[in-house]
């Protein structure tokens, strides 16, 4: 017999954040690392393309704040989701593991939001 009131799972929300963080980490983050870690120190940017004033102006704009927020939060959720499932796969059972890992991700998301807003 089919249960008319099945228990809803919260896993799709966490899988969505995990997937978004994985895509961000695979597509956007390497480009930023390439730009900031390799091309900028080697002087491959024209003039003041990434001067302090321009980067600060971008970071303080709405789009810049959203970008910084996503650059920090999405890989964070991806990593903590991966750690949660890695512990499960290794048979290391963390008491209330879902609360520990996803709670930490939620707390760090709030801290990041406060930091980005006050930037």
Swiss-Prot record:
Membrane topology: Multi-pass membrane protein
GO terms, biological process: fumarate metabolic process
Gene Ontology MF annotations: succinate dehydrogenase activity
TM helices/strands, residue ranges: 25-45, 61-81, 99-119
Record key words, sorted: Cell inner membrane, Cell membrane, Membrane, Transmembrane, Transmembrane helix
Gene3D superfamilies: Fumarate reductase/succinate dehydrogenase, transmembrane subunit
Cellular component GO terms held in the UniProt record: fumarate reductase complex; plasma membrane
Compartments, record wording: Cell inner membrane
Top-level taxon of the source organism: Bacteria
Keyword set includes ATP-binding: no
Family membership: Belongs to the FrdD family.
Self-association state and partner proteins as the record states: Part of an enzyme complex containing four subunits: a flavoprotein (FrdA), an iron-sulfur protein (FrdB), and two hydrophobic anchor proteins (FrdC and FrdD).
Its biological purpose: Two distinct, membrane-bound, FAD-containing enzymes are responsible for the catalysis of fumarate and succinate interconversion; fumarate reductase is used in anaerobic growth, and succinate dehydrogenase is used in aerobic growth. Anchors the catalytic components of the fumarate reductase complex to the cell inner membrane, binds quinones.
Protein name per UniProt: Fumarate reductase subunit D
Protein's organism: Salmonella choleraesuis (strain SC-B67)
High-level lineage: Bacteria, Pseudomonadati, Pseudomonadota, Gammaproteobacteria, Enterobacterales
